């Protein structure tokens, strides 16, 4: 099977042996594999090679604690295998009841005792040992949560702008995010059979949209409400830009082909912005979503996974060809895109009042890690708020948490709890609020350098540099750190992006902008944190003295000729 040739009826055909992932998907019996047998094998804490891949479709990654890997090897022990689970939560909305349940599970049944908010607008459990995996899924199911298709070659968790002010518009957009998620979800019964003891969540094993081999590679979708680009549209394969008239949603502009993952040293891989296909009315939304997915399903590269994402398919066959195929499959003709503008993407930390009169408190959670730290019992604090809160919580794509729908009568009480547990801290700088990192060490098997554990102290050093050059609080830099080039920390949409290359070393990228509409380019390769800070000191010194009025750091680096602007990624990024 691994030598079978795949043929694709499209200009610029990809012919070659199938990637081995295609074999295992086809032989998996619709994502079942032999996962159940592996669960019963208590000799090892891990899964076999094929099931290692298949559990991703069920929302899990096999990991181990890399901090103790070498010591366990010396003791002739296998790595401390465990799984990370990412929940499926379109739009990131979770109720207080659900929150208290996941808080309890994290305390009692994970190795790290934390809840990790992620850039995919959901939460992750880390350090779940094999005996607790089925319990985890059944616990989530009991509160109406699952992890179907949050990883693997499928459409993953659908993001939606967390806009607490435009309450009615947000609700409409959120409903569409849920509809899109359900429409593109795998139909196999494998998840229910394996984890829920046969309880049915779906009714058929046919996959009319995803197909028997599912997608060539992971696929990401967003629903976004301008002017906020908090979901970072250009990091995603498919984006629906909400267009409103008189406060009501009338349709979407559709953007296709974004993505940030690359491979070090492979110039055939690159970060890429999404292309604007045009406007569609609401009633064609699901048809267009399915058409984009099935076109990528049929035309995507199944021979080389490094070039398998939608962005490469678009560049290979041409935007016009891909767009025409989507129109044919969806039975729609894209109209000219409606005007919109992105002005920023950071969360509005603090209180905001919606047009419905309810109050919303956005809490800054550094790196999304909810854990009880010395002097800041963040995880306990959120649980205490959940015990009294009458609204819901909204996880953001910036790894923060919004206490949404707060009644005026509860506002003071919730703020008191937030301050008591360190969830509200007036001393947190704007620079820190606009910095984030992926998990990386010790749990991510792909990490080449530290990210989450490196960021806090590094941001302090950057804050000192900004102060040294006399820059006010509002003048900060969108800073992202990711431990490897796969891009979970979205460094390739930052004004200053650091991409892990080796322990203690990073590639330094410059030239993104505040709104997240420009790809940064590599400025320095494989340098240490000390060297990075020296470069930042020099660059910020120039920015402080040479910039024009209100010129952002990323815009300045391009205008000053420090870095060349990336306009067409395939042509410019590695030039």
UniProtKB/Swiss-Prot annotation:
GO biological process, one term: sulfate assimilation
Residues at which siroheme binds: 488
Pathway this chain belongs to: Sulfur metabolism; hydrogen sulfide biosynthesis; hydrogen sulfide from sulfite (NADPH route): step 1/1
Cellular component, GO, one term: sulfite reductase complex (NADPH)
UniProt-recorded Gene Ontology molecular function terms: 4 iron, 4 sulfur cluster binding; heme binding; metal ion binding; NADP binding; sulfite reductase (ferredoxin) activity; sulfite reductase (NADPH) activity
Cofactor dependency: siroheme; [4Fe-4S] cluster
One Pfam family here: NIR_SIR
Keywords associated with the record: 4Fe-4S, Amino-acid biosynthesis, Cysteine biosynthesis, Heme, Iron, Iron-sulfur, Metal-binding, NADP, Oxidoreductase
Cofactor binding remark: Binds 1 siroheme per subunit. Binds 1 [4Fe-4S] cluster per subunit.
InterPro entries linked: CysI, NiRdtase/SiRdtase_haem-b_fer, Nit/Sulf_reduc_fer-like_dom_sf, NO2/SO3_Rdtase_4Fe4S_dom, NO2/SO3_Rdtase_4Fe4S_prot, NO2/SO3_Rdtase_4Fe4S_sf, NO2/SO3_Rdtase_FeS/sirohaem_BS
Reactions it catalyzes: hydrogen sulfide + 3 NADP(+) + 3 H2O = sulfite + 3 NADPH + 4 H(+)
E.C. no: 1.8.1.2
Residues engaged in binding [4Fe-4S] cluster: 438, 444, 484, 488
Role according to the record: Component of the sulfite reductase complex that catalyzes the 6-electron reduction of sulfite to sulfide. This is one of several activities required for the biosynthesis of L-cysteine from sulfate.
Record-linked HAMAP family: CysI (MF_01540)
Oligomeric form and interacting partners: Alpha(8)-beta(8). The alpha component is a flavoprotein, the beta component is a hemoprotein.
Family (UniProt): Belongs to the nitrite and sulfite reductase 4Fe-4S domain family.
Protein name in the entry: Sulfite reductase [NADPH] hemoprotein beta-component
Organism, scientific name: Vibrio atlanticus (strain LGP32) (Vibrio splendidus (strain Mel32))
């Amino acid at each position: 099977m691994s030598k079978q040739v795949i043929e694709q009826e499209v200009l610029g055909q990809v012919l070659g042996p199938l990637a081995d992932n295609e074999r295992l998907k086809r032989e998996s019996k619709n994502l079942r594999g032999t996962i159940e047998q592996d669960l019963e094998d208590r000799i090892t804490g891990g899964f076999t090679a094929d099931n290692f891949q298949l559990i991703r479709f069920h929302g899990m990654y096999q990991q181990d604690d890399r901090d103790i890997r070498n010591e366990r090897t010396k003791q002739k022990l296998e790595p401390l295998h465990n799984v990370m689970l990412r929940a499926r939560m379109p739009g990131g909305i979770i109720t207080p009841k659900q929150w208290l349940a996941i808080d309890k599970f994290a305390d009692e049944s994970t190795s790290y005792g934390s809840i990790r908010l992620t850039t995919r607008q959901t939460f992750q459990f880390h350090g779940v040992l094999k005996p607790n995996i089925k319990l985890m899924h059944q616990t989530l199911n009991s509160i109406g949560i699952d992890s179907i298709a949050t990883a693997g070659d499928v459409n993953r968790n659908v993001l939606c702008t967390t806009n607490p002010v435009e309450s009615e518009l947000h609700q409409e957009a959120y409903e569409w995010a849920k509809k899109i998620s359900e429409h593109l979800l795998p139909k196999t019964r494998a998840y229910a059979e394996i984890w829920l003891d046969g309880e049915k969540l779906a009714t058929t094993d046919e996959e009319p949209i995803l197909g028997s081999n599912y997608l060539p590679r992971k696929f990401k979708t967003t629903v976004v409400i301008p002017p906020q680009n908090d979901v970072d549209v250009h990091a995603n394969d498919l984006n629906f830009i909400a267009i409103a008239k008189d406060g009501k949603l009338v349709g979407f502009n559709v953007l296709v082909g974004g993505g940030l993952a690359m491979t070090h040293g492979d110039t055939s891989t690159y970060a890429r912005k999404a292309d604007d296909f045009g406007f569609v009315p609401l009633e064609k939304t699901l048809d267009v979503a399915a058409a984009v997915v099935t076109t990528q399903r049929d035309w995507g590269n199944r021979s080389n996974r490094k070039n398998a994402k939608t962005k490469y398919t678009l560049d290979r066959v041409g935007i016009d060809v891909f767009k025409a195929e989507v129109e044919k499959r969806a039975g729609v003709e894209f109209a000219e895109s409606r005007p919109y503008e992105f002005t920023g993407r950071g969360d509005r930390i603090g209180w905001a009042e919606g047009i419905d009169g309810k109050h919303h408190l956005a809490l800054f959670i550094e790196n999304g890690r909810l854990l009880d730290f010395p002097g800041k019992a963040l995880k306990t604090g959120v649980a205490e708020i959940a015990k009294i809160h009458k609204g819901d919580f909204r996880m953001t794509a910036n790894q923060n948490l919004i206490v949404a729908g707060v009644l005026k009568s509860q506002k003071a009480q919730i703020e008191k709890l937030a301050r008591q547990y360190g969830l509200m801290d007036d001393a947190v700088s704007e620079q820190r609020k606009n910095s984030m990192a992926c998990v990386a060490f010790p749990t991510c098997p792909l990490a080449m350098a530290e990210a989450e554990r490196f960021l806090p102290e590094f941001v302090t050093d950057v804050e000192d540099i900004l102060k040294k050059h006399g820059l006010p609080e509002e003048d900060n830099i969108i800073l992202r750190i990711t431990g490897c080039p796969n891009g979970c920390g979205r460094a390739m949409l930052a004004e200053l992006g650091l991409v892990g290359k080796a322990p203690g070393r990073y590639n330094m990228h410059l030239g993104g902008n505040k709104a997240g509409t420009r790809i940064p380019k590599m400025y320095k390769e494989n340098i240490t944190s000390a060297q990075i800070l020296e470069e930042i000191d020099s660059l910020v010194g120039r920015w402080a003295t040479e910039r024009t009025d209100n010129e952002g750091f990323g815009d300045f680096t391009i205008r000053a000729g420090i870095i060349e602007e990336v306009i067409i990624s395939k042509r410019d990024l590695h030039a």
